[in-house]
Amino acid sequence: MLFRSALATAARRAGLLSNTPGLVTMHMGDGEGRLDPIFYVLDHSDVPAKNLLPTHILRNPGLIDAGADLVRRGGYIDCTAGADDVEVESDALKLYELLHREDVSLDHVTMSSDAFGSQPRFNEEGECIGLTYASPKYLHRTIQILVREGMPLEDALQLLTSTPAVLLGKEGIKGCVAEGADADLLVLDENLNINSLFARGKVAVWEQEVKMKGRFEQ
C-alpha cells in the first residue's frame, strides 16, 4: 500500500511540474480488494481523488458499488464498454443503473473501450486459440442503448466528451464545440447512426462513406 501512495504522490508531483493532470490510471480486475488500494491512498496521503482513475468498473457488482463510493468521495471512475454484441448490452444497462444511483455525478464518470487492443480468443474448453482485437463501435452502441433506456442524448455524450476532457486537462480543446477547440465533430441521423465525421476539421466520413484512410488502408 505504501508503494501505491508513493506512486500516486509521484504522479501528482509530476503533473504539478509539467502542468498536466498527473493521473494514475488503474486497470481493475476481479480481486476481492476492489478499490481498497485507492481508498488507502486517499486515507493516508494528500493525493486528491481526481488523480486516481480506475477503469473497467463494470466488471462485477462489488466493483460497481466501490466505484459509486469513490465518486461520492469526489473521485472519477471509467466504465469500459462491452467488447461484443452481447456484452455491450449488459454493460450499458449496468452503466445506466450506476448513473441513476444517489449522489453519483455524471461529471465524475467517463467511458472508454479497449478499441484496437488485442483480445484472446477461446474455444469451448476455455483454451486460447488465437488473438483478435476490440472494436471501437461499442462506444457508439453504448450511447444508443443509454438513450433507448431514457437517458438524454446530451447526458450520454458527456461520458465521452466534456467529462474526460476536464479530467485530462483538455477543457475547451476537446469534448466541446467552441471557437478555438479541435473540430472533432460526429454527425448522427435521427436513429443515432453515424452519418459523417470530422477529425480536427478534416472530413473523415461523409454521408457514411469513409474519406480519410490509414496508411495501410485502400
Outline where the language-model segments fall.
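Active-site core of metal-dependent hydrolases
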Residues: 8-120, 128-129
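C-terminal cap of metal-dependent C-N hydrolases
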Residues: 166, 171, 176-218
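Short, small-residue-biased leader/transition segments that mark boundaries at the very start
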Residues: 1-2
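Residue-level "edge-of-site" marker
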Residues: 83, 159-160, 193
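Short, surface-exposed linear patches
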Residues: 45-48, 74-77, 100-101, 131-141, ...
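His/Asp/Glu-enriched, well-ordered alpha-helical/loop segment
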Residues: 101-188
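Short secondary-structure capping/turn micro-motifs that flank functional sites
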Residues: 86-88, 162-163, 196
